[in-house]
Amino acid sequence: MDKYSFLNAASTAYFGDLYDKYLENPDAIEPSWRAFFQGFDFAQEQYGAPLQEAVPVMVQQVVSNEANKPSEKIEKEFKVLNLINAYRTYGHLLTQINPLAAREPQLIDLSIERYGLSTADLDVVFDSAKEIGLSPTSLRQIVSTLQQLFCRSVGVEYQYIREASVRQWIDQHLQKNNNTTPFSKEDKIRLLRKLNEATSFENFLHTKYVGQKRFSLEGNDALVAGLDFMVEAAAEKGVTHLVLGMAHRGRLNVLANVFGKNPQDIFSEFDGKDYEMDDWFDGDVKYHLGITAERTSRSGKKIDMNLVPNPSHLETVAAVVEGITRAKQDRYCKDNPLKALPIVIHGDAAVCGQGIVYETVQMCGLRGFKTGGTIHIVVNNQVGFTTNYTDSRSSIYATDIAKVNDSPVLHVNADDAEAVVHAFLFALDFRQAFGKDVFIDLIGYRKYGHNEGDEPRFSQPKMYKLIGKHDNPRNIYAQKLITEGLIQQSLVTEMENEYKALLDAHLETSRKEPLTVIKPFMQTEWQGFKIASPAEMLQSVDTTINKETLTKIAEVLTELPADKNFISKVKKVVADRKEASFQNNHIDWGMAELLAYGSLLTEGYEVRLTGEDVQRGTFSHRHAVLKTEDTEEEICFLQDLKHKKSMAKGDFHIYNSLLSEYGVLGYEYGYALASPYTLTIWEAQFGDFSNGAQIMLDQYISCGEDKWKVQDGLVMLLPHGYEGQGAEHSSARVERYLQLCAENNMYVANCTTPANFFHLLRRQMKTTFRKPLVVFTPKSLLRHPQVISSLEDLAEGQFREVIADPIADANKVKRVVFCSGRFYYDLYAEREKLGRDDIALVRIEQLFPLPVEQLKEVVAKYVNATDFVWAQEEPKNMGAYGYMLMNFDLVKWRYVGTPAYAAPASGSHTRDRKRHNEVIAKVFE
């Protein structure tokens, strides 16, 4: 049977429709048809006829004589196309990207025979060459070009990208100079100079500070050159702000040779000198510190550069980098976000093993978190501490996370310096063209162990035998230039001697200085702010606001647009707010919160609120964004204050986040770090879930100022309260936050009135310094009939760290009960029921810093009190009890609460309420 007989039934109209779809979007049709039409384009050119005419002609020629030359030619054109597509898809598996050894054999065959061609076809000219940017040429030349494009020192993965235009751009970009960058003699010498700086810097430290940890870059020295060329090119492309995050590996080298940190300061850190700062600053190890620098390109363009400080917890800084970048885009680059460039440098083991990488990568296309694309660079040592890569990932490459969001990957041999720079420039071009993420897999090695005092041959003796014989990238590149006749060895020696002399001079100067100087990070953004003293943190702050202004804001917040349709429940929410505010003068929690934001917006501050479900609020109390019934158009009254009512100067941003605590909290920490005039808030869905971000709390939020001399005003709203919902929906782990409190590092509050919450939020922006603020927010109090404030309370009041009991006769009080948060209302209800006027209930609204002087005044009021109690609903080993035990010694007091439990709460509602009521009863015994 004729194997082409099926073509007799071909419908010209069907071909035409399918071809139209192919032209519109090649990815929309079945892959085999896509391959057919790629070849058909060539055939159409050959016949010089429209598709409707060409199809019957081709079908007739194929059917009438299988052996005739035109049909053979067409069939082989298809085979060449298949070969080209195979190289595009699998060529990276055959690249020469390992500087230590040839790659292990891959289960891929890109021979011409595999695709139905033979050596007899090598000199046949094929039109398919146009697919790789060539004129019609021989198969021999096509194969040679394919090997240059896809199988040399740079391997590219991109065929999984769904957008055809992106793949086509990559194809065209690769075809320029056969996937290389042409370098002038000047560029090559500049490249050699940067390699020399990278190598000589490490050699200098290795000899001057023997055995000290520095986490050498050696084996991936070309990172410095790649970054240097990328920064220069970025400035030329209009980038004005660059934010870089990286771990310890090679950090000192990047600080010195990319960011221009004075080696003198690095040497001071190696010498272990004390800091010039006072006791409120403890500092950090040298390979964690950040820097802000301004670099001027060779053509005079300036670029603000920031290397973000970070802890040893790998990959955490990635989310922080994204947040800082977004803040800079919102402030400086509203016209073009691509002017701010985030770069994240990963380790090969960490990028595979740390889940925050996935959380951060998922942000790249989300409207509340996207930053116009991030350049990810994996410094691939082929080993993680002592663990071989075969034990640290299941994927072929360390960069396979890139496929989650259709990011291209460039795998590059770190010994090929020109290929490295080419890959870095390629990545920059891609990011600026599409505003999407791109990954570079910089495959090198680690010359020493994990640190310079570690013995790597315990675990990788074979690899380190190879490394011991391997020359460094500088010498390899220098020899290449010598072979090309561009330089002589004397130039290399001169470079090395000059740079060493420079470092020697800095070392001599450094050793004359008694102290280490830590320069401020992002000083431009933080001009006018100061480090707060303990007394300043407890000073009252004026948070009043004109009542008329508040009234106008309330009017905007309670008026639905008449020309929009909303579901009845939305109408009721807004109507109830209007009635409560203007008829009853009852401001509930949700309304007070929105008024706080609105008031700050009118004063020129910005507000950013993110977290899971924050637009509506987990407990349906906020409704900051309303949706129309028919189109789901978003209506945000707080944005209308600026854009429709011209009442506000600042912008209001509120975004439902991806379902992430760790990554999103890190992002918001970064945002607040770069935007001190923005009230930056992260709300947990339930406070219980905030411990999913524990690393961010422990390593950044609680101690960033103490370690890195950076302030951060991030607000965390953590719903907390025991209401019978079980162990996972009751406790924000108050005890853990209080355990982190020391040296004036943050505020911790547990408010009980809408007005106090209102003033607390305003205070966060009104101080001349910034501290993180942790607020344990209520759940049941959101609609509690007693939890209301008046408009006057908001306009005229201030934040009250302690709320004394307004009991009529303080002289009658025999027992003073201190408590915090929603538990107060349970105690209050019981006291009212019992008619006990001998017991005063004192609310501590700010737990840290503890307002000791105010507490003294409160205690002094109750001159006849002999019994002092700390009461809490949390178990004894949780809540604020342990903290109060350490810090509250004004009077001798006793604990009333449940005993210690392993879980925060019982899963049985009956048991939970029984325990709860027993505590209340004990308070009034």
Predicted regions and their residues:
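Cofactor-binding active-site loop characterized by glycine-rich and histidine/acidic residues
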Residues: T240-D406, L410, F619-P676
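Active-site cores of enzymes that catalyze phosphoryl transfer or operate on phosphate-rich substrates
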Residues: N179-F201, G272-E322, R326-C333, F637, ...
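Alpha-helix capping and helix-loop boundary segments enriched in small/acidic/polar residues
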Residues: F6-A9, S71, R214-D221, D304-E315, ...
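Subset of Sec-pathway N-terminal targeting signals
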Residues: M1-F40, Q44
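Active-site pocket-lining segments that scaffold enzyme catalytic pockets across diverse folds
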Residues: S200, F204-Q264, E579, I587-L601, ...
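Extended, charge-enriched "interface" segments that sit outside catalytic cores
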Residues: F40-A222, V239
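Conserved phosphate-handling catalytic cores of large alpha/beta enzymes
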Residues: G384-S395, K403-F439, I443-G449, R457
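Flexible, glycine-rich loop/tail regions that form catalytic "lids" or insertion modules at the edges
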Residues: E75-N85, H92-D127, S144, T199, ...
